[in-house]
């Protein structure tokens, strides 16, 4: 049995789904269940490093386009010594060596940079080629060369995926703002068709399970729903699916339209499971099993090693309009009039950052409200007294769980589903009616 997770997202801000997927990886690993987490697009080195930092392991990652090659592994195994021999490099070519990279320069001033993998000592993850200071090519390595990217003016024009003998098995070609995909003997004009052929490469069995963490506007959704393979298909709900006014969330329109194609649905809380059962009944889709499985877990409780900063409040989330961090800023600004010692730190990044920064300036709150960006929250929670959330809804609330595990007082709206799951009125925090 193999559990496939679709997908590890590329090109978007980090979010709670990423953390939930990493938690799933750790749990399945502990249970001894084979799991694969699918990159349906090739990740940048930075994005790959991000997912590995969350707790994913190289051997559990599945790169869709590499399935068209005869590669056996994508785990870095090429050592610095191996590549120095292949490139015929000497110590005289080395001009800079750091913990994470080795840079070589030649007589014509062109350069090579070996980028080392932090999880596999002395192994190279990728190599950059620079011509007159401009990036022209990047090669990725496992046991041998996996993929090559070709650049012009900092933009990728072509990406090739290699067999073990370095011949090209699959190719992506930029055509203006679109891409063509060359998979001999075919030339495919859209990525949905690439995903259809990728699924055939998996040779799915009846005991296998595919988990979709997202489906709306995803080019793998239609091939998965139309698959002939006997494997099971389940949808994991990470957001509100039906608003309290009865309107469906557009993110799940596709899911409800084809609900009968799914074998299971999974929610993060019992509360959402109850609402989903009602929604499916209204859609005429009774009988589909629904399981409530938390999307996160705590390895251990986090205790403060000293006194928490007095009157300290934090929130942590993607800076997105739905999170309504603007409300948190306004609330803290009002409270600051009565509690001048109040300090509020906002962790996370996102498209709302500039708007929130302007709001802080408008309220003249720069001295006590701060945007902190990304940080290792496990080390930060114990320094604060209160966790504040003003999100319109949370299907689970990973940061709520983490804050509760670190002993913070929790404040939030009495809104579905995470807040009433974690906040126990008068015990570990307070719920505010959303209408107020």
What are these regions (language model features)?
Residues 260-287:
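A short, active-site helix/loop in glycosyltransferases that binds the activated sugar's phosphate group
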Residues 311, 318-337, 351-354:
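A conserved mid-protein helix/loop that constitutes part of the nucleotide-sugar donor-binding site
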Residues 355-374:
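Nucleotide-activated donor-binding/catalytic signature segment of Leloir-type glycosyltransferases, i.e.
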Residues 374-375, 379-384:
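Short alpha-helical donor nucleotide-sugar binding micro-motif in glycosyltransferases
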Residues 392:
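Aromatic "clamp/platform" in nucleotide-sugar-dependent glycosyltransferases that forms part
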Residues 397-400, 419:
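Short glycine/serine-rich donor-binding loops of glycosyltransferases
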Residues 409-413:
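Short hydrophobic beta-strand element within catalytic cores of glycosyltransferases
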Residues 424-426, 430-436:
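Conserved acidic donor-binding segment of nucleotide-sugar-dependent glycosyltransferases
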